[in-house]
């Protein structure tokens, strides 16, 4: 093909990564971002790759599949992971970032590339020519209508909920202790211990609190990885005690005693003045949020700088619509990337943008497109979302279960995952030399 310009719609994690991968390969990019001309219900700035949920990109170790995915992306010169490494804040074995510095870094990196032209306007029709659609879970109504017409499929709806962010200075540090679970990495989390009585009182308040009403035509489907805390609470006390409030590995550093339940807070900014409440994504009404959070030991006088909010997430039925190259099956010059493909998570979204960007570049250069092998975390995600059961398709995080099985079965989980990680990184390093 002679066309040397690619349209990228959306400058979130996936779109920014796709634009970067295209630009560094000499391709001219028209990057469309409707913010700040038109905002979404969850975004607050005009920056690229704004994080609207947690500030954590999850595990940074090779013992976890998402850690392997990050390492693969580093080998492929990911703009998102480079910015995250640059803007990291203490988070034990995880990679968490100062969300404002991170978004600014990605914006500067992508916007200042000579091959990238940024156009701040809403795209209401899918353009002709090579295009990557990375408009995310909050795709505008106009473009959603176009996509529905294009795909011939009904959208699937579910909700992501963002956790509240609080001021550290408002916490009672006499009741809170610093520790990471099982003492992994540096002590990076503030822990609020609860007795059984305190937990029961908190659980009762949480289950009786009022939530923001949903529109009648919207169907509630919660993805397990970002379930609102009040929905979790209604499933039963044990759901919380085995979930975000589990006390295992968080024994008090002075007494050595294990609390009945623990609420963890994670640093949210580089200065260490703001903390988010881990796993407490919510769509409670704001007044109720504050009253419920005040029942957590140490948060009696909490100052909330950003209340938890809930927003719709939208994703397409990728198994019926996409190839492992992230190409649309019925139009070879159209690609999709990000959460709307059914990959779930910041890193997974960026990784899909990386693959779509590389393959869109290959397409316009007349080269063979890349299908990353299932031995890699990147390839296993692409394989999963394009080959799994169409009827029950749900979003998926990176995990070792998606990777191609090892030639020899290893019973020990730690050793098995180590083998998965080593094989994935060796494979991606070989591939990186050819693309």
Curated annotation (Swiss-Prot):
FAD binds at residues 10-15. Transmembrane segments: none annotated. It comes from the Bacteria. Coiled coil: none annotated. GO terms for molecular function: flavin adenine dinucleotide binding; tRNA (uracil(54)-C5)-methyltransferase activity, 5,10-methylenetetrahydrofolate-dependent. It is found in: Cytoplasm. GO terms for cellular component: cytosol. One of its GO terms (biological process) is tRNA methylation. Homodimer. Belongs to the MnmG family. TrmFO subfamily. HAMAP family: TrmFO. Catalyzes the folate-dependent formation of 5-methyl-uridine at position 54 (M-5-U54) in all tRNAs. This is Methylenetetrahydrofolate--tRNA-(uracil-5-)-methyltransferase TrmFO. It comes from Bacillus subtilis (strain 168).
